[in-house]
Curated annotation (Swiss-Prot):
Stored Gene3D superfamilies: Phosphoglycerate mutase-like (3.40.50.1240)
The gene coding this protein: gpmA
Record: residues binding substrate: S24, G25, R61, E117, R118, Y119, Y120, K128
GO molecular function: phosphoglycerate mutase activity
Any one GO biological process: glycolytic process
Keywords annotated in UniProt: Gluconeogenesis, Glycolysis, Isomerase
Pathway: Carbohydrate degradation; glycolysis; pyruvate from D-glyceraldehyde 3-phosphate: step 3/5
Site (Transition state stabilizer): H187
Catalytic activity from the UniProt record: (2R)-2-phosphoglycerate = (2R)-3-phosphoglycerate
Active site: H12, E117
Entry EC no(s): 5.4.2.11
Role noted for this protein: Catalyzes the interconversion of 2-phosphoglycerate and 3-phosphoglycerate.
Protein name (Swiss-Prot/TrEMBL): 2,3-bisphosphoglycerate-dependent phosphoglycerate mutase
Amino acid sequence: MIITGHLILVRHGEPGLKPGERLSGWIDIPLSRKGIEEALECAKALENIEIDIAFASDLVRTQETLFIILSGQKKTGVVVHEKTEDKVPPEKLDWYSYPEKLGEDLIPVYTTPALNERYYGKLQGRKKQKMEEKYGAEQVANWRWNFEPGPPEGESLKAVYERTVPYFRKKVMPALEGGKNVLICAHQSSLRALVKYIEDISDKDIREVRLSTGELAIYHFSEGKLVRENEELGPELKRNI
């Protein structure tokens, strides 16, 4: 059975930095071996949902994860860079907009900085333990998990929300309204922002939302609303609210 009208949110697989040691942010680092395995597990979990269109951030770890997932469906992503789309209207990019002209195994993949991880400012790329020693573990945790404020010279979750959600409304919602199965591969912060918007989570409760690398959340688009499907939460999306 082919499933249609779904939104799949996937956090990228583990990056090459030691897990939990550094705050990656905008550091553009590829997947580790474990990250590749996590992406393969996502591909297996999604084998019954045929992806029609996909979105990723500008950072390579999300794109690697996404293409591994697509390869599990024997599909090839045709990348539409945001700058290309700005210069040439989508309706002129026939083979981007309608990849079935080149075969059903090709689907458009839109990459955008709107889905990037938060910029960590003075914490960017620094060892988490060192930052906790300098600022205090509680303060670092507040910067990372509260809706606002963000770290020194960096983005708060609110700032990420304000760039991620408008993009989602403009680019992703039309595809869902058209009955497409949409895959978004992004980061802890940008996905938390989307989950906050979709599930109408309060500024206070969003602190408890966590997504581990390689985890996913699936929503069904019905009657103009996105309804969560994998409510068991378990390994898919860890929430404690």
